Amino acid sequence: MYSIAALCIALAASSTILTSCEDDEDKTTTEVSGVLENGSTISGDITSNTTLAEGYEYKLSGGVHVKEGATLTIKPGVKITAIDDDTPDYILIEQGAKIDAQGTASNPIVMTSETPENKWGGIHICGKAHTNAESGSGSSEIGGAKYGGSDDKDNSGTLRYIRLEYTGFALDEEHEANGISFYGVGSGTTVDHIESYKGGDDGFEFFGGSVNVNNMVSFDSSDDSFDWTEGWNGSATNILAYQMSAEDDCLIEADNNGKNYDAVPVSRPTIKNAILIGNGGDGRGIRLRAGTQVILDNVVACGKNMPLTVETGQTETALKNGDATITNTTISANLNSKESIYTNEDFIKEPTNNIDATGITIEAAKGLNSWLNESWIVLK
């Protein structure tokens, strides 16, 4: 059996509205393109290449849609603050548009709200990769933008060294904003070193697509830390989920398609080098259901009464026959099987899997994974 320690070691444009003001002067609104001024308020559509300059601070008001053919560039050290009002403030990258948001470990990009209670709308990326939703396409939950297609290598840009704080705007009782929502995002998109911090919904959610993500942190997301559906078949490598409240939902919630468990292409991502820490309560840690498949390797899941749950015949059968696999994985209590097809006995029959009630703390995780000590990450 692998010990927990061994497991963890591996582990604005022409139509953009810009508002700026000087002391003792009324605010003025002008249309801009190119590099936006320090202190500007960003709102509306971006239809040509637009840059937020290094170290500048900006306000975000309402939905900002980056339109096809345009690129929104965000330089290191930029801080974007969502205005506290009743309007959903969010950034949405439409099909054919790109975002180039590259912070650094010492100078990350920070997107936040005026107060922790003011939940804002996060980032939404709509690509041209597959979704197994009916008709092969869909509309984003916030912003109503089209996503889906057949280009699994589609490139929506680059996101690196970004911290998103206090997302989770409630559009209605059914729809709240994630830190980042990936809608049909292709593998040509680069995503690494991203933190969702104290969001009011999921940290990161994948709706189909083939995007691969690395070095991702979901800290105290009040719903699911990581969530996928609609046929996502990319990968997530070096990830941390940490929950402070026992009321938080799943550390990973995974579906193929909630309306059609047999929809194709089937969700089958690779999750490798993952530390998933709950904080008590009766919730589930990893919840595999609705026909999803998965490759889980080198994972620790603890801090939940049910750290690993498998549901639905399609999901459990895939695990039983090897279409889905769980290896090098330690959970803090027995696996829970709803259909009794893939059982706790099957889990421990794999010699690299283990059940260890000890679990792991956030401090231990930091001690075993040097990247979690980088200054761009907040873990308190």
Describe the predicted segments one by one:
Residues 79-80:
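Short active-site-proximal "capping" loops at secondary-structure junctions
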Residues 1, 10-40:
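Bacterial Sec-dependent N-terminal signal peptides
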Residues 2-3, 217:
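Jelly-roll (double-stranded beta-helix
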Residues 26-72, 83-96, 103, 112-201, ...:
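Extracellular beta-rich repeat passengers
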Residues 107-108:
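Glycine-rich loop(s) and the adjacent beta-strand/alpha-helix scaffold that form part
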